[in-house]
Structure formats: C-alpha cells, structure tokens
Amino acid sequence: MHTLTPAITLKTLPQGKHHCITTIFSPLGLLTFFAKQGQSLYYDFREALIPLSLGVYNLDHSPPKMRKLLFAEVKNTFTTIKSELPLLQAAGKMTQSILGSQWQEKPSQELFSLFLNFLHRLPESKNPEMFAATFLLKLLQYEGILDLSTTCAACKKTILSASFYRHKGRKFCIEHSPESAVMIENEEEKILHALVHAKRFQDLLHLSNFHLEFSEKITLMFDSVFHEDKHKKLPQSNGSA
C-alpha cells in the first residue's frame, strides 16, 4: 500500500551505519518510515530527511513492517529559520510540541495547516519565543483542553481575584490550586484569550510581542498536559529492507 502526502520532517534518527528512521507530520498525522541508505551522502532524498523540511513523501506500507520511503520531493527548507538561532529554537519548540502531543497516524489536517502557517510566519515575529508559545496555546485549544471559563475547576465558583492558577488546561482559584499549577495574572489571561481567539496571523504577530515571562508560563502549562515520557508505539522496523 502506498501513501502520498505533503509533510514536514520533525526528526531523523540513525539506524545502523547507513540507514535512518524519520518521523514526519502530515495531514494524516505523525508517520514514521525507514530510509535505506538514508545516511549516505549520495542518497537521492537526503535533504527531505533533514528536520524542518517541507516536502511530498511517497511511502510504501506493508504491515506490520514500518513504512519505507520510496520517493520525496522537497518544497521548502525554511532557510531563514535555520539561519537564525532564535527562530530555530522557536521552531524546535513547536516541533517538540507536535512530537509530544500527537499519536502516530492520528489524522490532523487542521493542525498540520496551523503548524505550516506558523512556520511560514515565524520569521516575521519580533518575539519568536512568544510566537512559539502561542502555537502551544493553539495546540491546547485544538485538543479541547484549554479552559476559557471564569470558574474554578475544583469549587466551581467564579474567580474574582487578580490572579489564579492553571494546571493541565484547567483553571483554579487560589484556595484550590494544585501544587505544580502556574499562577496567571488577569492581564496575562486577557492576552491568552486574545491569542486563542485571534483569526488573523497579523493579530497573532502583534499580540506575541508580550513579555517573555508569559511564554515560560505557557510552556509550563503545556508541559503539565503533555509529558515527555508519553510513549508512542511505532510499527516494526524494516532494517533489512
């Protein structure tokens, strides 16, 4: 069975001396494939295996074996992002958020389009770290786990204080905040709502010029939902192909 899909390369790991295993993000979700001789300098599709490469990938799939790369054509290497460290770090944060939150082969057309658009607009941002944090918020919203109500998840009372706490996407009053919750000021909550509801990237770029401390809080909020030790079961490697 063949799969032809646009995708963005997220990571490539060596497999033996000459081969590699690559994970891409596509409208079909995360897909992982085996590239025979992928580490070779003369491999035809080597550029398509480099992280942060947008391309079209033709994969062969014979379950339970891992997919194999048949052909790839690179469409965009995001050269500007890769040439500036702050942009590369921001793109890396978004990449890791996809790897840490999505399951293999979970269809994600909307999220793929969102991720691609964020990468395209990232070089325009004056605050790449906050722009990447905005993507984390959008991802939480996409997954339906970002509480935008005005009530505490524990006591169900309206939060009237100047600050409150967020944990695992939910809101808590000061009295019922979990130990590892992140404190949010009302001003920050207003920015959060504006970012989540913004429909135009020009608005997102403007709103992302907020202070860096808030981006750190967003990252902590995201990490409280999606942990690094989340395991994804991959198909059987076809190292002998």
Swiss-Prot record:
Top-rank taxon, per record: Bacteria
Function: Involved in DNA repair and RecF pathway recombination.
Alphabetical GO biological process terms: DNA recombination; double-strand break repair
Family: Belongs to the RecO family.
Protein name: DNA repair protein RecO
The entry's keywords: DNA damage, DNA recombination, DNA repair
Gene3D superfamilies in UniProt: Recombination protein O, C-terminal domain
Signal peptide: none
Pfam families the record matches: RecO_C
Organism expressing this protein natively: Chlamydia abortus (strain DSM 27085 / S26/3) (Chlamydophila abortus)
One GO CC term, this protein: bacterial nucleoid
Keyword Lyase set for record: no
SUPFAM superfamilies: ArfGap/RecO-like zinc finger, Nucleic acid-binding proteins
DNA damage keyword on record: yes
